[in-house]
Amino acid sequence: MSRVVIHTANMIPGDWANMCQAVWRSPLLPLQSTTAPGPQQSPGGGVYGTGTRFKRDLLAYLNSYGRQKTGSLVNQLARFDFRAVRAALLASVPSKKKLETMDSQKETLWGWPAVRDILRHVPPRQHSKPSHIVAQVDSPLLAQTFCQSNH
């Protein structure tokens, strides 16, 4: 069994000491059986909110750091069954890709393009209470842009 724990802090003392942080943890993940589908067996890597998609995006995020730094962790996590996970991973990595060429079914999106894509796939709730979005943004400019948007 394994568990994924994700924190919102950057790995710098200023973030740990001076900012509010959040932690998300997965359910316990069993080793993947030989019959359990892996991310490569699902067209497009799965739907947001599924374990298949979460695993694909998490492994892509870790791979973005380079195989030398995170390859061992990627290999270990690839052995586990993520089907119990019901979450969408939203991470940020440096990228110079053009927005109009991005396709989340073919590759993991990062940062603001990922926010846009994930929110497009979240179905609206069918009741009268307003919905809430909780976000942590460490840039004053991005926080102002995001928090003042009515969309």
Q: Predicted regions span which residues?
A:
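Conserved short internal alpha-helix adjacent to the catalytic or cofactor-binding core
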Residues: 4-6
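Charged, low-complexity intrinsically disordered terminal segments
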Residues: 12-151
